[in-house]
Amino acid sequence: MKYDNLLDRFIKYVKVNTRSVPDSETTPSTESQEAFALTILKPEMEAIGLQDVHYNPVNGYLIGTLPANNPTLTRKIGFIAHMDTADFNAENVNPQIIDNYQGGDITLGSSNYKLDPKAFPNLNNYIGQTLITTDGTTLLGADDKSGIAEIMTAIEFLTSQPQIEHCDIKVAFGPDEEIGVGADKFEVADFEVDFAYTMDGGPLGELQYETFSAAALEVTFLGRNVHPGTAKDQMINALELAIDFHEKLPAKDRPEYTDGYQGFYHLTGLTGTVEEARASYIIRDFEEASFEARKVKVENIAQSMNAQLGTKRVLVELNDQYYNMKKVIEKDMTAIELAKEVMEELAIKPVIEPIRGGTDGSKISFMGIPTPNIFAGGENMHGRFEFVSLQTMERAVDVIIGLVCKA
């Protein structure tokens, strides 16, 4: 179905810079996210008929409710999307709209960049559709403002068509998903549902309930700096220690060599001098045993290096970030079965595969609300080559409406 306000709503949202910032001491991590919630989303939520719309300054969540209009539809379903965008330029987003895409290259504004089907063969899936792209200078922000726009549009449709019967609906828009802390302060008591869905997936049909389990690893290397001319048997180069540590990790267990259910170690940052160096990693795996084994391995490498050095010069700090939500959701597959049924009725083929990443639903599921992930349409997310199909967004709205009407 076509929805008149969907495209304009999406364009309005992505033009607001809501980029999150790691290592911030505030929630949300940036003031722009709170401003987006309070000045744009909250008034709109109230205008389209959501009730009890309120913003929680402690956790940065904006929540609203649409009560059931049929008492026999007893389920309570939630829909969640995040307001922040990823670590890429998000200032002055200037979307361009490609009507009736017919294949070939798409020049991104006046930049020297282009979307080329040879580099991005996923473009070939969108012949004849309306695509929204960047101008080559920013990301687009479909992750996850497409999800916000889809939820808003579904609610607007339901309130404008009161004869359409639906269950109780809760809506939540939250901060800081991209930096991994968005759901840390989520309050289950303020979101009383049987289950929920994050509208945060990619192409048409995605339905996901398996995520990575994730940990952050910080390794500090303590060297000893002396003049290189007299360094023999005295200098300990912290940068060399960092290189040695990295080379002791399995070379093929890196993102660029893995897919499917394979986990990895990913070096995300390396800074330092001869005196001190610091390496930042993320650790990812699907199975609990292999996830734990990866953490044990880095501890063992550090212990072995320290033993060889005769003192503690390799310091490891490990922090779990989130866990594979499959462990929770597989205990009650109602949310998955309902979504599959709705998609199939809409002639959408469910694509059930693991998320090689995480969502807010990972943490929220472990808080007691099973929260799988549904497609929102974004492609090539987190950079200048990001795009989304309007038709896929429309289908996501169809799914949301189908879920609450079938509950």
Swiss-Prot record:
Q: Record's superkingdom?
A: Bacteria
Binding of Zn(2+) 1, residues: 82, 143, 200
**One GO BP annotation of this record:** proteolysis
Q: Which cofactor does it need?
A: Zn(2+)
Q: Which reaction does it catalyse?
A: Release of the N-terminal residue from a tripeptide
Asked whether the UniProt record includes Protease among its keywords, one would answer: yes
| Keywords for this protein | Aminopeptidase, Cytoplasm, Hydrolase, Metal-binding, Metalloprotease, Protease, Zinc
This protein's GO CC annotations = cytosol
Endpoints of the signal sequence: none
What residues make up the catalytic site?
Answer: 84, 177 (proton acceptor)
Q: What is its EC number?
A: 3.4.11.4
Q: Give a yes or no for keyword DNA-binding in this entry.
A: no
Residues reported in the UniProt entry to bind Zn(2+) 2: 143, 178, 382
Cofactor binding note from Swiss-Prot or TrEMBL = Binds 2 Zn(2+) ions per subunit.
InterPro entries in UniProt: ArgE/DapE_CS, Bact_exopeptidase_dim_dom, Peptidase_M20, Peptidase_M20_dimer, Peptidase_M20B
The record's principal subcellular location, in a coarse class, is cytoplasm
Q: Where in the cell is it found?
A: Cytoplasm
GO molecular function terms listed in the Swiss-Prot or TrEMBL record:
metallopeptidase activity; tripeptide aminopeptidase activity; zinc ion binding
Q: What does the protein in this record do? A: Cleaves the N-terminal amino acid of tripeptides.
Entry similarity comment? Belongs to the peptidase M20B family.
Q: What is this protein called?
A: Peptidase T
Which source organism?
Streptococcus pyogenes serotype M1
